[in-house]
Amino acid sequence: MGLTLTQKILSAKIGREVKAGELIEVDVDMVLGNDVTAPVAIKEFEKIGKEEVFDKTKIALVPDHFVPNKDIKSAEQVNIMRKFAKKHGIVNFFEVGQMGIEHALLPEKGLVLPGDVVIGADSHTCTYGALTCFSTGVGSTDMAAAMATGKAWFKVPEAIKFVLKGNLQKWVSGKDVILYIIGKIGVDGALYKSMEFTGNIKALSIDDRFTIANMAIEAGAKNGIFDFDEITEAYVKGRAKREYKVFERDEDAEYSEVYEINLDEIRPQVAFPHLPENTRSIDEVGKVKIDQVVIGSCTNGRLSDMEIAYKILKGKKVHPDVRLLIFPATQEIYLECVKRGYIEEFIKAGAAVSTPTCGPCLGGHMGILARGERALATTNRNFVGRMGHPESEVYLSSPAVAAASAIAGYIVSPEEVE
């Protein structure tokens, strides 16, 4: 049998064909850490006794979870990263003011490219599969070993193929597609497998693809990955500062399952507490009152997400019982929102706009929920206590549904506020 797209990339890295289930050691193209995971990795790296990192250009350190620093402990965490980067001459350390949410920032800076093998000490490292590379989350000890050796080990995953057909309806986006898929297969439906997306992928923008790949981990997947096409090429062009290689799956590649996803049939989706698989069509939600709306994150903080929110919020007001928080994912996105007038309209509507941070998504800072409060968020997880008090609730949706709901005061379709 032939090789899947993920297996093709891994095979090229070790110089022979791999098969599902075998353990392999692979050279990595990028090693990523943030202000939660990198300090642990740095301490482990120092225990190894290496004088230098394997390659100062292939490590990215991005403080994003608790920045700007929310307290003394978070400030100390970032300082560990800062000192380590300076000591080892690490090129890709992104200080406050230059930083962004890591999984939006690295593609934007051209640090992850088609055909790469990327590991990150963050579970949503799978985001970069939108660019036809193998990217996956690891623990801090694996990050430490990779910083020292430039290598990581994996069990080669089996794969599930998702064949996309049709086109997206108005107000339906990549977030709705991945919520629909997770609702269909469950949070363990792709456990340690590669989710490979093919078919009519041209119906999805690159931002849609980032969103879908980002949430592959919410189905338990090892990685998510899209075919390379002209949309991928257009995004990478002008960002890539080195050569990259494009891979294609074999026609006779073996998949554990194959799903056909008809995009025409997907309506806006909402994931109810406390799992991303608890999805319902917007038409089945009922009248769910909300206290807070969050638009942003590594899942939905890109420019197209901001544009959708702008189109819905322009000339309208946030409901008096709702707090709307908007987080552009990078400084570049933030600046473009300023230039286009999005920020002005957000503020006029009654939203609070923040510098890039992961803060509210993980219940870290800048948007914590109190007991009994209910949030609708464009983030990727809605576990118990994810955004604050254990007795709060988090619902997940697209930016379109989130913006519309901020106006209405309860979860609604964008069609209801047009």
From Swiss-Prot:
E.C. no: 4.2.1.33
> Where, in this chain's numbering, is [4Fe-4S] cluster bound?
C298, C358, C361
**What's the cofactor?**
[4Fe-4S] cluster
Which reaction equation describes what this protein catalyses? (2R,3S)-3-isopropylmalate = (2S)-2-isopropylmalate
Q: Does the keyword Protein transport apply?
A: no
**Cofactor comment in the record?**
Binds 1 [4Fe-4S] cluster per subunit.
Question: Biological process GO terms, please?
Answer: L-leucine biosynthetic process
Pfam families tied to this protein: Aconitase
InterPro entries noted in UniProt: Acnase/IPM_dHydase_lsu_aba_1/3, Acoase/IPM_deHydtase_lsu_aba, Aconitase_4Fe-4S_BS, Aconitase_4Fe-4S_dom, HAcnase/IPMdehydase_lsu_prok, Homoacnase/IPMdehydase_lsu, IPM_dehydratase_rel_enz, IPMI_cat
What keyword terms does UniProt attach to this protein? 4Fe-4S, Amino-acid biosynthesis, Branched-chain amino acid biosynthesis, Iron, Iron-sulfur, Leucine biosynthesis, Lyase, Metal-binding
| Pathway of action | Amino-acid biosynthesis; L-leucine biosynthesis; L-leucine from 3-methyl-2-oxobutanoate: step 2/4
User: What molecular function does GO assign, one term?
Assistant: metal ion binding
Q: What class of enzyme is it?
A: lyase
- Say what the protein does: Catalyzes the isomerization between 2-isopropylmalate and 3-isopropylmalate, via the formation of 2-isopropylmaleate.
Cross-referenced NCBIfam families: hacA_fam, IPMI_arch, LEU2, PRK00402.1
In the record, the note on similarity to other proteins reads: Belongs to the aconitase/IPM isomerase family. LeuC type 2 subfamily.
Spell out the subunit comment: Heterodimer of LeuC and LeuD.
Q: What is this protein called?
A: 3-isopropylmalate dehydratase large subunit
